[in-house]
A protein has these predicted regions:
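Conserved ABC transporter NBD signature motif
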Residues: 41, 45-65
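H-loop/switch region of ABC-family ATPase nucleotide-binding domains
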Residues: 177-179
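Catalytic Walker B motif of ABC-type/P-loop ATPase nucleotide-binding domains
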Residues: 143-147
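Hydrophobic anchor residue at the start of the ABC signature
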Residues: 132
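Q-loop/switch helix immediately C-terminal to the Walker
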Residues: 71, 81-95
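Conserved ABC ATPase "signature" region
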Residues: 90, 99-115
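The feature captures the beta-strand-to-loop junction immediately N-terminal to the Walker
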Residues: 25-27
Length: 222
């Protein structure tokens, strides 16, 4: 996959099993966002060869690929600035015909106090949590999350991780890109590294082992 005639990544195969969370780890500029955008099905031009399917359904042939939702790393730039957080959530719930319990979701993420504020008045961290709530509110079985913990303090990171963990417990599949290796190691069942333009699956490890493997892979073992 890549841009135009330029190939950026060769991914081989990537499988998300029901009720599992996988982490995507690589330095900036290595193609993580390109990969996640391609996997989302929203950018078919990113895929130069091969195929992409959710529950056996090819995204090029069926609207049922809406079973997958992608949360970008835009930091809230893709939210409508004049609409409130609750208006965003209501729109998502209606668009996906979701039965998600919005009140319970917002309480669990701690965003209830500012639901009525227009998103332009929210901090980066608040916007990030609203976006995560929107992704979960779709009730899609596949969540692709690009840096969902960016801009969050430790307490908010915990509530966000707990929310993602709850989705996994419900049988949903989550793919998470993050540089926060401690959180990622605690949250996920497996990891994928991007090494020299190739996606490589890693065995589940502790956060210390993950950090060391990251250093060995990208920093020459420093």
């Amino acid at each position: 996959m890549g841009y135009g005639s330029t190939t950026i990544l060769s991914i081989g195969s990537l499988f998300l099993s029901p009720g599992t969370a996988a982490g995507l780890v690589a330095p900036n500029g290595s193609g993580k966002t390109t990969l996640l955008e391609a996997l989302s099905g929203q950018f078919p031009a990113r895929i130069r060869s091969g195929s992409l399917a959710a529950d056996g359904i090819c995204h090029r042939r069926s609207a049922e690929f809406a079973e997958l939702v992608y949360l970008s790393s835009s930091g809230g730039a893709d939210l409508y600035p004049t609409l409130s957080a609750i208006e965003h959530l209501a729109f998502v719930r209606e668009a996906w015909k979701s039965a998600a319990d919005i009140d319970s979701l917002c309480d669990s993420l701690g965003i209830s106090p500012y639901l009525d504020k227009p998103t332009r008045k929210l901090s980066t961290g608040m916007k990030q949590q609203v976006k995560l709530a929107m992704a979960i509110a779709t009730d899609c079985p596949y969540l692709i999350l690009d840096e969902p913990l960016n801009g969050l303090d430790p307490g908010k990171r915990k509530t966000s991780c707990d929310a993602m963990r709850s989705e996994v417990a419900r049988g949903h599949s989550v793919l998470i890109s993050s540089h926060l290796l401690d959180d990622l190691a605690d949250l996920t069942d497996s990891f994928y590294f991007i090494e020299a333009g190739t996606l490589v699956e890693k065995i589940k490890s502790s956060s210390q082992t993950l950090k060391q493997e990251y250093l060995d892979t990208y920093e020459g073992g420093e």
